[in-house]
Every structure is written in C-alpha cells, then in structure tokens.
C-alpha cells in the first residue's frame, strides 16, 4: 500500500495497513484460521491506537483478495463499530479459497465452509462497496456477485473495472476506482470532501 497511501491521503482519510502471517512482512504460516484470528487481534490493536490518539472518526474496513475474508470477518463481528466495508477482488468465503489452493475437501467440509460463508456474509449489515476487475481470472467476478448477493447490507454496491484483472485493477480503473471509494467514504462516513 506504500504506492497508494498518497491516494488515500488525497481523499482526506487516514490509512492503517496490516500484514497477516505469511503475507507481506508477516512471518508464520498463512492459514484461513490464522488470518481470521489475526484480523481480530489487529482490529483490537487498531482500536487501541485510535483510543491512544483520541481519534474517534468513522472506520472503514478494506480488504483485497485473501484480505477480503479478514475484512468480512471483522465487519461481521463489529457492524456497530464500523461505517462500512470495501472489498477488492473478493470472494464469498473460505470454500473458494480452499478450492483455488487445491485443498481436497470432503462433502462435510464443503458444507461446513459453505454454511460459515453464508452466516458470515448474512451477518454483515454495514454499508458495503465491492470493486472487481471484469477480467479477473484468479478470482472470477462471479465470486464478487455471490458475495454481493449474500451480504445483508441495505446500502451495497458493486463496481467493475472493464478489462482489469487481479493485478491491475487500480491502474486500469484509476479514476473510477478512486471516485467510487471517495463517494463511498463521503456518503457513509458523513464527511465532506472539502
């Protein structure tokens, strides 16, 4: 996010970025359970940082790809504490993550993950913005549509970036991408862009 922080600052928001075990600068083994556990600890730490700094502004949770699962998990457990959730190149739950990782699942495991995904997404009532590339073959756009359909949020939107794939979403959709995020933040955080 180093390359994007100026873009976030230009729309008058602060940015808190975290890495998970086995991703970015995080050490350890990346697993679905670890990332969900880590997301709760990270959110608790984030709230402590805000409290220590006497910062009490609105909170938007954002996650990309595998990070979207952690963002969904936080949103599902903290609807009242956040102003919204933004996902980028997201999927509707851990079942898809297991499938693309090549993990063999029994029918019972598939059913359990499917139920977990539905419960997770159905419990989210915070406003939601989903951003996805139309040419994303790593996580097909149908996954974002499934997620959109599962969310209980009354205020939700999905935007797609034509010709964008998993890695070039921000580059190809730059103006539309930032406009959508800006509008979402200003609408759901009750702040003015000026």
PLM regions and their residue ranges:
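Short beta-strand/loop motif that positions the catalytic acidic residue
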Residues: 123-125, 130-132, 136
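Catalytic histidine-centered segment of alpha/beta-hydrolase-like enzymes
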Residues: 164-175
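Hydrolase active-site cap/lid region
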Residues: 70-126
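The serine-hydrolase catalytic nucleophile loop
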Residues: 1-7
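Acidic catalytic loop of the alpha/beta-hydrolase fold
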Residues: 135-139, 166-168
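Short alpha-helix in the alpha/beta-hydrolase fold that links the catalytic acid
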Residues: 126, 140-149
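Alpha/beta-hydrolase active-site loop
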Residues: 29-52
